[in-house]
Amino acid sequence: MCRASQSPWTRDLLCELGFHYDSNALNDDLPYWDMVPTGRRMLILPYGFDTNDMKFFHPNGFVRPSDLSDYVGAALDVLVAEAGQGRSSLLSIGLHLRICGRPAGFQAVRLILARLAELGSKIWIARRRDIAAHFRTENPIDVSRE
């Protein structure tokens, strides 16, 4: 059992089972291709734990709903500014029903949604599968470099 971390075989198993991407990496702001031990390529859609409501359960984490929404808002401000300079990024916002589905936690969701609405066309709100499809189209595997 691996709990939240991966085993050395996880990505191979994901490929074998037909998964199109892995979102269990915390190491980047952009999707990328990774070579798995059997030589296959796996699309990695990194996940950011800093913008995750689980921080409400961490002793040094978020306390008030505005802690999460302010943090996400600050991240959005930086990423929108960077996008204005031509740099793309991926911001994952992790929400769990058992946390932000509760009344006080849901206030954070409302605040985040309001901020996203303010940004309008400056951002793309997408499901992970849509991000994966877009990345595959824009960054196909170059088999000549294999």
Regions found by a protein language model. Name each.
Residues 1-87:
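Active-site-adjacent pocket scaffolds in enzyme catalytic domains
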Residues 21, 69, 73-146:
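C-terminal domain-boundary segment and adjacent tail
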